[in-house]
């Protein structure tokens, strides 16, 4: 298997670009990209509002909501599997440990309802969740009666609308965009069954979501949830096409995020509803990570925190001066790297996450890179092929902020026509190669 590798030097001295042995154009000069604090970039919306907003919620409120969304009416006959699901969620909220992705989502939506913000969630399988993670609508196994706990919250000041939609992405996206653009107080969410299927609604994404404000002054808080991740499911169930959304991102027209924990997702949804400047939000959501212990959060993290544009390596605090390679990544690949057997041995490697892909958190990333005084290289790691994912955009953004003597490298799959392998053994081999390469410096 040929490795995909690219290397550039900082300080304006580009080295040859190598990808599967093929030369490519030199990196753009630093002058072509906006500097930190560049007034023009901020005016164009290229730099998101650094005031992250107060998105934390009190423990008492979260626990009270948790009690309500894990309860069923007296005499309701829930299936034993669903009852176990509710009991596990109730225990997580009571103990404050193990808050998973779907629980974070439910708590975010419920707290918005209490604040008076309508929440509307539609998609091809949103009631249950494509991966059986949500279970917002319960069915009495004896009578067939439906019950949605989230629609019966005490002190709710706005309705929660929940709709399993037809298998027509373009029709649903068009309707939901129209709804969102006409009601600024609503958080309108459309979820694809798999992120790959969003391409069936590409006309709405291109003509309205990405450019509606530029053409007609139409703004919205329209939110897309696109399940994404290379987990061996094949080319039609692996990629939400991060590269396509990033290619549409300009002039601050949208927000694009790839959160890696339940708490980050919780704060991201609340921020989207509360932030003063409405923009569409594209979220690349997980599949296997929905139940991954490493991606869970504590209830405390939902109270006194906010959405972080980037997450530095928490394990590097005591060994910052030893770090010579800084790995930058986004989404689920972080957990593959952080959970690998080689992680503990790589003392000179730090692994940081870019949670907000657009607008680019230029100032924060630049400060983080500068804080590693003995850095030799920065590596962008992704599981997507090099002509897909975030690499093309990240390369352009990152090269201009490399300190003197620090190189910018790429590790991931080489250029491909198809998003992923169709053979599980080949997938596992590639994932292992990427993770091992990320933790093995070239010096």
Over which residues does each language-model region extend?
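Flexible, glycine-rich loop/tail regions that form catalytic "lids" or insertion modules at the edges
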Residues: 1-443
């Amino acid at each position: 298997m040929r490795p995909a590798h690219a290397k550039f030097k900082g300080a304006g001295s580009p080295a040859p670009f190598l990808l599967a042995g093929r030369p490519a154009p030199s990196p753009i000069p630093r002058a072509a990209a906006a500097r930190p604090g560049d007034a023009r970039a901020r005016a164009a919306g290229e730099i998101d509002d650094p005031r992250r907003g107060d998105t934390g919620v009190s423990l008492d409120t979260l626990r009270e909501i948790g009690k309500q969304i894990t309860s069923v009416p007296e005499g309701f006959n829930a299936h034993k599997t669903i009852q176990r699901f509710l009991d596990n969620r109730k225990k997580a909220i009571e103990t404050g440990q193990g808050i998973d992705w779907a629980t974070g989502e439910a708590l975010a939506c419920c707290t918005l309802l209490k604040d008076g913000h309508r929440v509307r969630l539609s998609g091809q399988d949103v009631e249950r969740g494509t991966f059986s993670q949500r279970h917002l609508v319960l069915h009495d196994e004896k009578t067939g009666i439906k019950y949605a706990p989230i629609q019966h919250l005490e002190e709710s000041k706005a309705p929660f609308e929940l709709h399993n939609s037809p298998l027509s992405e373009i029709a649903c996206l068009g309707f939901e965009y129209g709804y969102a653009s006409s009601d600024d107080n609503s958080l309108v969410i459309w979820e694809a069954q798999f992120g790959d299927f969003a391409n069936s609604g590409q006309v709405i994404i291109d003509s309205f979501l990405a450019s509606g404000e530029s053409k007609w002054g139409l703004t919205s808080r329209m939110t897309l949830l696109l399940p994404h991740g290379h987990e061996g499911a094949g080319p039609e169930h692996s990629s939400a096409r991060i590269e396509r959304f990033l290619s549409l991102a300009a002039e601050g027209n949208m927000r694009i995020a790839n959160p890696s924990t339940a708490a980050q997702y919780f704060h991201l949804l609340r921020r989207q509803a509360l932030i003063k400047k409405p923009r569409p939000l594209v979220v690349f959501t997980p599949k296997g990570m929905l139940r991954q212990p490493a991606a869970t959060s504590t209830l405390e993290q939902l109270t006194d925190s906010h959405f972080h544009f980037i997450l530095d390596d928490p394990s590097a605090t005591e060994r910052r001066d030893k770090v010579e390679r800084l790995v930058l990544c986004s989404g689920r690949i972080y957990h593959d790297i952080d959970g690998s057997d080689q992680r503990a041995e790589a003392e000179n490697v730090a692994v940081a996450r870019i949670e907000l892909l657009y607008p680019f958190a230029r100032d924060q990333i630049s400060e983080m890179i500068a804080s590693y005084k003995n850095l030799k290289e920065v590596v962008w790691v992704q599981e997507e092929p090099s002509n897909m994912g975030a690499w093309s955009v990240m390369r352009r953004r990152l090269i201009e902020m490399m300190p003197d003597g620090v190189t910018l490298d790429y590790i991931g799959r080489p250029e491909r026509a198809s998003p992923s392998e169709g053979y599980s053994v080949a997938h596992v081999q590639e994932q292992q190669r990427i993770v091992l390469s990320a933790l093995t410096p070239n010096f």
